[in-house]
Design a protein with these regions (language model features):
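Membrane-embedded alpha-helical bundles that constitute the cytochrome b-like, heme-associated redox core
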Residues: 1-285
């Protein structure tokens, strides 16, 4: 019987025989994810009605969730679908007693849950924040890497968040449609395209590439099959191959789509604050 032998490796945080700059990637990813989380948290709470957040957003008489100039409606993806307790639409399902909560608090669990349990992001924050494993052939501060066990088995909920994330793409696509409609008091609806419309459209494309290239989605549409048979098999195979192509660059889609979500929100925030102007490129009022 062959006995497995482990190669000798120095013990201690960051100890390794590697001579390359292995730490640059987890450090850069840690900074990137940290900035994204802090920004999304700040913007999400900005529209809340308690504590210091009363000085911003709705509480201060401002509205930074959507561009409403020139008769348009360009809603930030951080607040979509818009849920305002006690008001029309989805807000009618929420008790009015929760008026103090930011609309983002009701919906961000879906994208946050999907990304937080994503296979790529799990690798990223395990390395960047938990340093376990820090990198290949790099020692950890907590002994040998044991893999995802015990509490971390909860990460398997990712496959269920995937279905919600796919549905979320339709919601964001509807927001793009609304962003092409311009309304004026007492007149019919006209159509057009602004820079904000294109920003939201690109956001859907980026999120589509990330979501539809997800490992769980790839498994759901084809990974569970031993072979593709007749009677829809050709269509299923084509979908699976397309998903596989996206999956090959899943890490890039994860990084760039997250950036674009934050940029989309910042663009809308900047326009509502008067720093930028949402130019109408085609049609409009």
């Amino acid at each position: 019987m062959v006995e497995a032998r482990h190669l000798p490796m120095e013990r201690g945080l960051g100890k390794t025989d590697r001579i390359d700059d292995w730490w640059k990637s987890p450090l850069a990813m840690g900074i990137y994810l940290g900035i994204a989380v802090m920004y999304a948290t700040w913007r999400g709470f900005m529209e809340a009605d308690f504590w210091i957040f009363e000085e911003f957003g709705r509480s201060a008489g401002n509205q930074t969730m959507a561009i409403e100039s020139n008769g348009s409606h360009v809603l930030s993806p951080l607040f979509s679908p818009l849920v305002v307790p006690g008001q029309d639409g989805l807000g009618s399902w929420v008790p009015e007693s929760l008026w103090w909560m930011s609309p983002a608090m009701f919906i961000l669990i879906i994208p946050a849950g999907f990304r937080g349990t994503c296979y790529y992001y799990r690798k990223a924050y395990y390395r960047s924040f938990m340093v376990s494993p820090a990198a290949c052939a790099v020692s950890t501060p907590f002994g040998d890497y044991k893999g995802e066990s015990r509490l971390f088995l909860f990460q398997n909920i990712h496959r269920y968040f995937m279905y919600l994330a796919v549905a979320y793409l339709f919601v964001l696509s509807y927001d793009v449609l609304l962003a092409t409609q311009f309304h004026a008091t007492g007149s019919a609806t006209s159509y057009g395209v602004s820079v904000g419309t294109l920003v939201l459209m690109m956001n859907v494309i980026m999120l589509g590439g990330y979501t539809l290239g997800c490992h769980s989605f790839r498994h759901a549409i084809g990974g569970i099959r031993n072979r593709f048979r007749n009677g829809g098999g050709a269509v299923a195979e084509a979908c699976w191959k397309s998903c596989t192509k996206l999956n090959k660059n899943h890490g890039n889609w994860a990084i760039y789509s997250l950036f674009w979500v934050m940029f989309s929100d910042f663009y809308i925030y900047a326009c509502t604050e008067g720093w930028w102007t949402d130019l109408v490129l085609l049609g409009g009022l």
